Amino acid sequence: ARHNMAQAAATMQAMQDGSLEKELREANAAALDWLGEEDGWEIRHAATCRLTAEQRRLMAFAAPLLIYNDEAVDAVESEVLPETYRAQLQSWWNITDRDSTLGIVQWLLHEGHHADADAALALMCGGQPDAGDPEEKAEDVQLIAEFMIENGYCRAETLPQTAIAWDLVRIANLGRWALHAGYLSEEEMWQVMQVAADAAREYFSSWEEYGRSFAFGRGVWHGDEEDCQTAWEIVSALLEEETSPWRQIPWNA
């Protein structure tokens, strides 16, 4: 693992001058032009939005997974059956009630899947990790960091410094899922979303930074480049499309 970290650090240094990433970005753009535009990810909206401006802002922090699950970005309502939510929450996180829901919120906030990734990232970039096990996710962090730079998702100097947005997006969605499972009240759901929003504002200064960290964390989660690519496609739609809550709601609103 230490060899992997040294190799990753060397790779990062080699990419600092920007020539390789520029060449790869141009090749990628040319390929997309040749292939033509794809249908892409749809940003769905409720026929009638019943949310306040503040509620819409909080929902925006959940947007990447709402789009991934083909749900409206401005509606609490869901077509999924409550028993489906209950089964999924128990399968994913052993959530069965209010207390276990709030326990997972705290776990995602303070550890989740970002702690080990952040430790590996800090070591790879020449720093010292504050927590987590850097060797646990070293290979996955190197793989996804190189993938994001090579594909023009970021430059070496704008590589995310944390994978926490992956866990924060899940916190924001968990609040809503737990509401529909019958474990949280609507007021508690908004409080959980506020936890995600407050943490996001602490770590990031823009929707772009938040989205880039989400894509990085999603990829590192299973060390899967396709997961990272899918996440970045969704993030790109949120950053670029006029109907996106990320275009309509300022980061510091």
Residue ranges and their predicted role:
Residues 2-186, 193-253:
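Polar/charged low-complexity regulatory segments
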